């Protein structure tokens, strides 16, 4: 997602929808960002303990309980936002970027997004192998490149730099499916039946005008 990162070292970055903070740790340690790990469902105290166990202090990474639709930060606070595997839950609203997210990004700042997606729109005729693991309602959160291009292009405040299929599709799925958490276990039926040929991961890069 950020292999060609345009965010300078030392930037203040929001990891939006950070979960338990794995991405937050990576971008703080590897890229030297000051990271705000913002998530509605995780416990900031537990995340802080995890960050400290990884040798990262609050000077480098700060856990924040935050709703993506009502972020508790000053306007133009962040140099960049990175959002991995969560934007598809709240960002399908065409108004979201301009009204809920970009106000907190500095002019010229970047937004990097990675979402699970589909190679093509098949929602009107869902492959049976996908239905082994997910309901039609759950699959609505997986959309194709043209869908996301249309969504982000509706923003009046963002320059669309890139919307493309990520190269790491098979590697990411392989790493995920060996996990023993209930979600990974549930996904195995579809993927073992060949469902992966319909799926991808989509990279979105935006720059605030």
Language-model features, listed with the residues they occupy:
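A short acidic, Gly/Pro-enriched loop at the edge of an enzyme's catalytic core
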Residues: 69-81
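Class I SAM-dependent methyltransferase SAM/SAH-binding core
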Residues: 14, 20-70
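Conserved Class I S-adenosyl-L-methionine
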Residues: 162-209
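Conserved alpha-helix/loop element of class I SAM-dependent methyltransferases that forms part
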Residues: 1-9
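A short glycine-rich, Lys/Arg-flanked "PGG" loop and its adjoining helix->strand segment in the class I
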Residues: 95-110
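Short alpha-helix
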Residues: 140-156
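Short, glycine-/aromatic-enriched active-site segment of Class I SAM-dependent methyltransferases
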Residues: 116-138
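A short SAM/SAH-binding and catalytic strip from SAM-dependent methyltransferases
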Residues: 80-93
């Amino acid at each position: 997602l950020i292999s060609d990162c345009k965010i300078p070292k030392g930037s203040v970055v929001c990891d939006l929808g950070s979960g338990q903070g794995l991405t937050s740790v990576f971008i703080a340690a590897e890229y030297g960002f000051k990271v705000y790990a913002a998530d509605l469902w995780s416990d900031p105290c537990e995340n802080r303990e995890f960050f400290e166990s990884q040798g990262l202090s609050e000077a480098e990474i700060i856990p924040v309980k935050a709703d993506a639709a009502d972020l508790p930060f000053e306007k133009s606070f962040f140099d960049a936002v990175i959002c991995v595997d969560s934007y598809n839950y709240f960002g399908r609203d065409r108004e979201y970027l301009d009204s809920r997210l970009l106000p907190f990004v500095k002019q010229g700042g970047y937004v990097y997004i990675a979402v699970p997606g589909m190679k093509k729109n098949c929602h009107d005729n869902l492959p049976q192998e996908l239905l082994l693991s997910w309901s039609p309602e759950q699959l609505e959160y997986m959309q194709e490149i043209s869908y996301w291009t249309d969504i982000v292009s509706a923003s009046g405040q963002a320059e669309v730099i890139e919307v493309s299929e990520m190269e790491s599709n098979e590697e990411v799925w392989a790493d995920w499916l060996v996990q023993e958490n209930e979600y990974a276990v549930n996904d195995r039926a579809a993927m073992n039946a060949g469902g992966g040929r319909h799926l991808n991961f989509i990279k979105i890069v935006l720059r605030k005008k």
